[in-house]
């Protein structure tokens, strides 16, 4: 199962997930000026980030919105970025946050687990109900695919719904977590984790999530630019595994800390990943 490959990558390379939420404003001006169009510039930037971090990162997360906003040319860029990572043997998470009834979900599954936009994992929103997961299950069983379901997200507005109190002294996200854990047991890999994972932001603490969701692998966003703390992120791991900690802007814009002109932006990105790994190990 794909979750075993991800688990092995974390064991070998560490738990950092590099987010390719690449905006044109992130590119150093000197680098951007070498290109005649935006799409080629962003793709070359993505390539150099991937190449420089490949041996020290568990996987990559590509946020589709940054590419959709560029229209058809942006979606071609998105396709090329996914392909580049996968052809190198890397694992890529398509951050698409889809969620819909079964007939529509079937098309989403086909769109993002096959063809032009094929990825290894995708993110889904389960708050329409767990029946929205049905069309994806064949891909878990037979086609080496997985998902991360939004459980408790890193944005401030997550408290509007996810944190609502229920009658049994639990919150909405606790109940959703129970469902994710139970459904996931059908798709366990040899590593003991399921190909159905959960998104758990590290901008707020919740010590019981890791204990309660023993078989659920976590995608942990919010580190760095969103204010998530390393000690919180590490609390969601189990002996350094069981999750991946994502950083996007913190890695892509790391050059601004050391090299404002960005002549060595990929080296700065690599150093940021290595520093993240060290911080998460030490705390």
Curated annotation (Swiss-Prot):
One GO BP:
'de novo' UMP biosynthetic process
Q: Where is the active site?
A: 97 (proton donor)
Keyword Transport part of the UniProt annotation:
no
- Judged by the first EC level, this protein's enzyme class is lyase
Q: What are the entry keywords?
A: Decarboxylase, Lyase, Pyrimidine biosynthesis
> According to its UniProt record, in which pathway does this protein act?
Pyrimidine metabolism; UMP biosynthesis via de novo pathway; UMP from orotate: step 2/2
Its catalytic activity?
A: orotidine 5'-phosphate + H(+) = UMP + CO2
Q: Could you cite one Gene Ontology molecular function of this protein?
A: orotidine-5'-phosphate decarboxylase activity
UniProt similarity note? Belongs to the OMP decarboxylase family. Type 2 subfamily.
Q: What is this protein called?
A: Orotidine 5'-phosphate decarboxylase
Recorded source organism is Clostridium botulinum (strain Langeland / NCTC 10281 / Type F)
Q: Taxonomy-wise, where does this protein's organism fall, top ranks first?
A: Bacteria, Bacillati, Bacillota, Clostridia, Eubacteriales
């Amino acid at each position: 199962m794909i979750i075993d490959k991800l688990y092995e990558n974390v064991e070998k390379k560490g738990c950092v997930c590099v987010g390719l939420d690449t905006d044109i404003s992130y590119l150093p001006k000197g680098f951007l000026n070498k290109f005649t169009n935006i799409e080629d510039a962003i793709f070359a930037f993505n390539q150099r980030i991937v190449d420089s971090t490949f041996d020290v990162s568990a996987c990559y997360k590509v946020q589709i919105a940054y590419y959709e906003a560029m229209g058809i040319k942006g979606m071609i860029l998105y396709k090329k970025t996914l392909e580049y990572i996968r052809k190198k043997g890397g694992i890529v998470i398509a951050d698409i946050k889809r969620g819909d009834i079964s007939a529509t979900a079937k098309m989403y599954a086909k769109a993002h687990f096959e063809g032009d936009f094929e990825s290894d994992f995708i993110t889904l929103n389960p708050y329409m109900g767990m029946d929205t997961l049905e069309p994806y299950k064949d891909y878990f069983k037979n086609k080496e695919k997985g998902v991360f379901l939004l459980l408790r997200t890193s944005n401030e507005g997550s408290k509007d719904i996810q944190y609502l109190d229920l009658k049994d002294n639990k919150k909405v996200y606790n109940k959703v977590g129970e469902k994710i854990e139970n459904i996931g047991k059908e798709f366990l890999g040899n590593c003991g984790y399921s190909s159905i994972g959960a998104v758990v932001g590290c901008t707020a603490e919740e010590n019981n999530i890791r204990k309660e969701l023993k078989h659920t692998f976590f995608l942990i966003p919010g580190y760095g630019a969103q204010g998530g703390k390393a000690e919180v992120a590490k609390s969601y791991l189990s002996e350094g595994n069981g999750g991946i900690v994502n950083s996007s802007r913190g890695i892509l814009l790391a050059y601004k800390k050391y090299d404002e002109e960005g002549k060595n932006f990929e080296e700065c990105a690599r150093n940021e990943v290595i520093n993240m790994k060290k911080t998460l190990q030490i705390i």
